[in-house]
Swiss-Prot record, chain A:
Protein name in the entry: Dynactin subunit 6
Keyword Transmembrane helix: no
Alphabetic keyword roster: Cytoplasm, Cytoskeleton
Gene: dnc-6
Function: Part of the dynactin complex that activates the molecular motor dynein for ultra-processive transport along microtubules.
Coiled coil: none
Phylogenetic classification of the source organism: Eukaryota, Metazoa, Ecdysozoa, Nematoda, Chromadorea
Length: 180, 413
């Protein structure tokens, strides 16, 4: 293993083996990464906080030149969403097929509706909702419902039906350290 | 679907002379005519909510102002609102744009039913005016009705069903035999708001036209309310000549089955383009590939005659006669010309035949090339038999079906 491809996954995080993780990626406690999620940190590191859910085919790609990409806690990246945002805060919901363009940033409690785009020059204030085909945005008083039940359920159920990334890696690092 | 199957490219001529795609046409077996939406009668046979599928009777729907009491749409993005419970009370939330009824300064309710809506502030005044106009109408019509000998007795059982609110009208007429005339006060004119006023009162969020149309009564200074879902009607189709039902769906709104269905597909040959047409060049012969399917329950004698001129593309192929077996007898070998014996017939497959027609476009055709075909077809008589199954036919009555013909427009673009 080279220095640039260090994947660090916390012990309580559930990362399916089908996830495609490249480069320096840190995933903290309690996160759930479904199969076929892509973390592409070949151009810069990706730091993921606690208790985030990454659904199937979500793509998290750092397109900056060496700048770290930071994702906070309790976010949900739904199916087929694409994120190249330099910063995503906490408790956000990124909808199905939503796109966060290069260099944009999302603060806390935001929601990006299905198929909506946050453009690269945009910095979403707290509690902003992006919706409709024309990417209307407004500040909302309604909080996102990120219930802890969903992530707890996923953490419990996923290991029974999927091979986990951590397990495979653990075996690989064990054999690597034995060879040293 | 019709785009996928390329139905939209071929238009059939209806009995009334209009051109429609085959799925839009119905067929009356009794009149033996093709009918389109313009020459048939539509009739609402069921009123229901498109969200919760709860059916309503006509008076019930009128009472509810044709809106569902329990379903609400988001006033911002028109998605479905879902209910969230908090402290035994519910409020409505849009999962898509995160609008909630709390943003409209609405108190949480005990249940999702009858969410408050904006009523017309002038509703009482309007009612008074309409009542007054009705009384005027009565007085004006009274001498005419007397002359005609109509004295309110001519009401039939049809009206007693009160499907269209006639009973109410009758009652009102009876009551209003000697209507009193109290002229309604004219609505006092109010000052029209100036542009400055409107700008001052306006909230920060501008509304789209769709949002305003969903709730036209709400002023720009007031917050938007949850939109009650308008009810939808299901239509049954009748023939305009014999008034027999041609299309009627099964009871219940959740079913997609038909009780009576008499679509033109079941009778008319189904003609489609089987391959896209190559680029048309002036003076050069191009091929148009058609597939013709007999979906009816009896064998069909069909003649296809290409028509030229009158703004249609020149077709050099001769008229072709085909005998198509029914879809039921599809495993018996098809009689008639075999594929390898004809230039025109490309393939033969059970109840389906592929044709190749040659067209020579001129300069004028290129902008909107259109091929005109005259089809003449005739079933072997079993169709008429099945339509007359409610009476016993004498042997001499079992004649072949009448010959029908229709023009076809094939869009070659
Ligand atoms: Zn018609
Ligand atoms: Zn409803
Ligand atoms: Zn909404
Ligand atoms: Zn008829």
């Amino acid at each position: 293993m080279t220095e640039t491809s260090t994947v660090s996954i916390a012990s309580s995080a559930i990362v399916c083996v089908e996830a495609d993780i490249k480069g320096e990626v840190i995933i903290k406690e309690g996160c759930v990464v479904h199969p076929f999620v892509v973390f592409d940190a070949t151009k810069g590191p990706i730091y993921v906080g606690e208790n985030n859910i990454f659904e199937e085919y979500a793509v998290i790609r750092n397109n900056s030149d060496g700048q770290p990409m930071i994702i906070g806690d309790w976010n949900i990246f739904q199916v087929h969403s694409k994120s190249s945002a330099k910063y995503v805060g906490s408790r956000n919901v990124i909808g199905v097929h939503a796109v966060l363009e290069d260099g944009c940033s999302v603060s806390d409690d935001c929601s990006v509706g299905a198929k909506c785009t946050v453009f690269s020059h945009q910095n979403l204030e707290p509690s902003v909702s992006v919706y409709a085909a024309t990417n209307l945005s407004r500040t909302t008083k309604t909080p996102n419902m990120t219930s802890p039940h969903q992530i707890e359920f996923l953490r419990k159920i996923l290991p029974s039906y999927h091979h986990l990334y951590g397990k495979k890696k653990a075996v690989a690092t064990a054999s690597a350290s034995a060879a040293q | 679907m019709s785009e996928l199957l390329q139905y939209s490219r071929i238009k059939y001529e209806c009995t009334c002379g209009k051109f429609r795609t085959l799925p839009d046409l119905v067929f009356c077996r009794y009149c033996f005519k093709i009918k389109c939406d313009d020459c048939s009668l539509g009739e609402v046979d069921n009123i229901f909510c498109p969200r919760c599928l709860e059916p309503s009777s006509v008076p019930e729907a009128r009472l509810k102002k044709h809106k569902c009491a329990s379903c609400n749409d988001c006033p911002k993005c028109a998605n479905v609102l879902s209910a969230r419970t908090e402290n035994d009370n519910v409020y409505l939330v849009c999962q898509y744009c995160r609008w909630s009824s709390r943003e409209a300064n609405q108190e949480d309710q005990e249940n999702t039913k009858s969410w408050p809506t904006k009523e017309n502030p002038l509703v009482n005044q309007l009612g008074e005016v309409t009542a007054y106009m009705k009384r005027l109408e009565l007085i004006e019509n009274a001498p005419k009705d007397l002359k005609k000998g109509k004295s309110g007795k001519a009401w039939t059982a049809f009206h007693l069903k009160d499907k269209f609110g006639f009973q109410q009208m009758v009652d009102k007429r009876k009551k209003a035999l000697a209507p009193e005339m109290n002229p309604v006060d004219a609505h006092a004119p109010t000052e029209a708001p100036t542009l400055e006023d409107e700008i001052k009162e306006r909230t920060d969020d501008l509304r789209t036209l769709d949002q305003i149309i969903m709730q036209p009564l709400i002023n720009i200074s007031e917050p938007l309310l949850p939109v009650q879902v308008p009810l939808a009607g299901r239509v049954q189709v009748r023939c305009d000549e014999c008034e027999r039902t041609l299309i009627k769906r099964d009871f219940g709104v959740t079913t997609f089955k038909f009780k009576i269905s008499s679509f033109a597909r079941q009778f008319v040959p189904d003609i489609r383009m089987s391959r896209p047409v190559d680029d048309l060049k002036v003076g050069e012969t191009s091929h148009v590939f058609l597939s013709i399917t007999n979906l009816s329950s009896s064998a069909m004698d069909l003649t296809i005659a290409p028509q030229s001129g009158n703004g249609f593309i020149q077709c050099s192929s001769d008229p072709i006669q085909l005998l198509l077996p029914s879809s039921r007898a599809s495993d018996t070998a098809a009689p008639g010309v075999h594929a390898d014996q004809s230039d025109v017939i490309v393939f033969r497959q059970h109840n389906r035949v592929g044709l190749r027609l040659d067209v020579i476009p001129t300069e004028m055709d290129l902008s909107s090339p259109c091929l005109n075909l005259l089809i003449t077809y005739c079933q072997d008589g079993s169709f008429r038999l099945s339509s007359a199954s409610d009476k016993i036919l004498k042997p001499e009555e079992t004649c072949p079906d009448p010959i029908l013909s229709a023009n076809l427009k094939v869009d070659l673009r």
